[in-house]
Amino acid sequence: MKRVCLPSSSEDSDDNGSLSTSWSQHSRSLPSFRHEDRKPSEVFRTDLITAMKLHDSNQLNPEDYYVLADPWRQEWEKGVQVPVNPEFIPETIARVIAEKDKVVTFTRPRKYIHSSGSEPPEVGYVDIQTLADAVCRYDLNEMDVAWLQLINEEFKEMGMQQLDEYTMEQVLEEFEKKCYDKMNHAIETEEGLGIEYDEDVVCDVCQSPDGEDGNEMVFCDKCNICVHQACYGILKVPEGSWLCRTCALGVQPKCLLCPKKGGAMKPTRSGTKWVHVSCALWIPEVSIGSPEKMEPITKVSHIPSNRWALLCSLCNEKVGACIQCSIKNCRTAFHVTCAFDHGLEMKTILTQEDEVKFKSYCPKHGSTKKPEDSHFCRSASDGKDTCEASPTFLGGLRVLEASQQNVKHGSQRKLKLQQLEDDFYSFVDVHDISQALKIPLDVTEYIYQYWKLRRKANFNEPLITPKKDEEDNLAKKEQDVLIRRLQLFTHLRQDLERVRNLTYMVTRREKMKRSVCRVQEQIFNLYTKISEQEKDLGFPLENGLLFNTQPSNPDAPKIEDLKWHSAFFRKRLGSSLRCSMKDSHKKSRERIIGKSLDTEILLTDRKKEGQTSDVSFPLEKTVAKIKPVQQKNGGSFPEHRKRRDSRTQGDTKFDSKEKPLRQQHRPAKHTEPPERPAEKKRALSQCGGKSATASSNKKQCSSSLPRYSGSLIKIHCNRPSVKVPTSPIKNWGGFRIPKKGEKVQPGSMETCQPNLNCQFLGQVSKKGRTKEKVKLDNDNDGYTPDAEMSDSESEPTDKCRLQRLTSSSSLSRGYETDFIRRSILAS
């Protein structure tokens, strides 16, 4: 038996767990509706899914089933959608539709849709402009209110209707409006001014008095200028009044290219600058954008700077841009408007290529003369036929006549304007205003009489500002605000530029200070390094250049003392470097000095017998040079020279020990002439007569050998100790700074000026003497002090020079250079 079950939806099957189909409760309530429509519907069958399910305990091969590991598994419990009545499914039918005619459909324009009709777009909507126009612009003041109270009392006595404030304001505003409109029309028209125009007037642009059909001469009804239609770009002459561009805008600008105000002017592309049309035509760099409208004026920026710098020969003003005479070699400059005013010859030539050329001539090269000018010249020359007046004088006369005529027309215009202002009430019709406002004529007449009194009391000035002028004032205020903002931004830009320049200069200054500090730091580090090196070598720091600055004390040593100290320490440095040799070299040197001492003692005995020896030549030569200088200078020696001379007599024995050692390191020069025996004897006599006794006791003599202790040489002998000189040696010498490209040859000798009393002196080669002689002559400029050369010392070979340190020692070269530089800095 087939079980009949009602179909159910998927929700019902999920809730009760039934495996059969069932209809929803709503479907059961409307069974007839379902059967009547016979529309296909769908049901969710869950039995199909249940039949596919197996229990987990069933044993199956892995190939016979699928494992559902997806969380979407719960969706399978809802069943499968199946149609209830598949036979009633509608069939798909397709048919061909004929093409429709192309109809222009409405598309929204790019701009908004504006309603140009007078009717409001919506019922009850009133435009804001209409509301603004309906508001009365005149407000009663205290005087008006007082008069209104008085007139209302009279109206009450007369039995008339009283007047309210709003009606009075409307009537006064209408009076002002009618008066302003009719007065302006009278000023702008010929019949209002009543002035007849001159028939000989010329065009303000081309200066031609002739008019043609289609190119009529048009007059401005406000400024009274006359222009051709083509010259000013008037496409169509209006029937009524016509105003030029400047008068239409109500501005009185100044021309950008000349100093003249007024005239036929057109704006530039920006609209803020104005230029005369004649100036734009005659200046070659300037162009006109539209020749039909003759505006805007373009390419003003193309005018060269030299044209802007020209000085007008007629008005003597350097304003705007001038043109020059068309004659090739003439450079006379003048403004275009000045040339027209002075009557200069200005030609417009049409070429065969339909090009227009403009030719202008200065008063000297111009040939234009008017009959009245020639008549004046003839009368001024007492009947002569020739005219001797200058063109400039004739031009001045024409300008004077033109100015007188302009003054005449201007005075007539002013008189007429004054008369129109006095008769202002004649432009108001009381009857028309009464009908327009629907006010009784008597009331309007009372208000009219009061309005006349108020205007006359206000010097015929209007009681309210005209609407057009008010709008212009507002526009001008807005323009002024924009100009002020532009000026503010310009000033701000300039201030920022100043700040930028200031910061740049401050940064540059700080960088320079930083570089100077770095240089000072390097110099200080170098001085510190030199001081440390001097300290390591044993020099006392109080005698160094860094600590030996010149104080403000008057008893302090002078610059010459510093120079002498630098040279003295340089010589001591050479001695200290030689003292830093190995011990073996010291011992060998002592042995050599001992042998040379014995040799010198033997040679002394031979000198007593009149014999000479080449070995003792350096000693004899050095000692023999002292006496002639002493004989020449006498007792005028300074104190330090006396001490040095006494030291020379006591140190002769020590010098005789050092000389043979120097001869072993350097070959003897046989080119030097031997000294005279008399000088040798005098030199030996100064050394003392007990030299033979010293030779008998070698142990005692060996004790007088120099011993090295640090950087100083200490001599232990029986003679008194000699102090270090504290005063500068006269003519101590100078150091020559080598040039940039000059190279110092290795082994060359550095020379100084001759000094007889200086220790550590040696000989140089003949070639070196010759070169040094030229340098010393150039440095001394022909001056030779007494201490340098005596009467008997005329040969360059008699000069003694400082011996330079060995060039192979880099340390010696470095210290020598530092001492030389420090000596120069001290000087």
From Swiss-Prot:
Any one GO molecular-function label of the UniProt entry: zinc ion binding
CDD domains tied to this protein: ePHD_JADE1, PHD_JADE1
Secretion signal, residue range per the UniProt entry: none
Any single Pfam family the record assigns to this protein: PHD_2
Zinc finger map (C2HC pre-PHD-type): 252-286
Compositionally biased intervals (Polar residues): 16-30, 692-705
Domain of life of the organism encoding this protein: Eukaryota
GO BP term, pick one: apoptotic process
Zinc finger region(s), PHD-type: 200-250, 310-366
Disordered, as annotated region: 1-35, 622-705, 769-810
Biased composition (Basic and acidic residues): 646-661, 669-682
GO cellular component, one term: nucleus
Keyword Zinc found: yes
Keyword NAD (UniProt): no
Family per record: Belongs to the JADE family.
Record note on domains: The 2 PHD-type zinc fingers are required for transcriptional activity.
Subunit structure: Component of the HBO1 complex composed.
Name of the protein in its database record: Protein Jade-1
Lineage, highest ranks first: Eukaryota, Metazoa, Chordata, Craniata, Vertebrata
Gene that encodes the chain: jade1
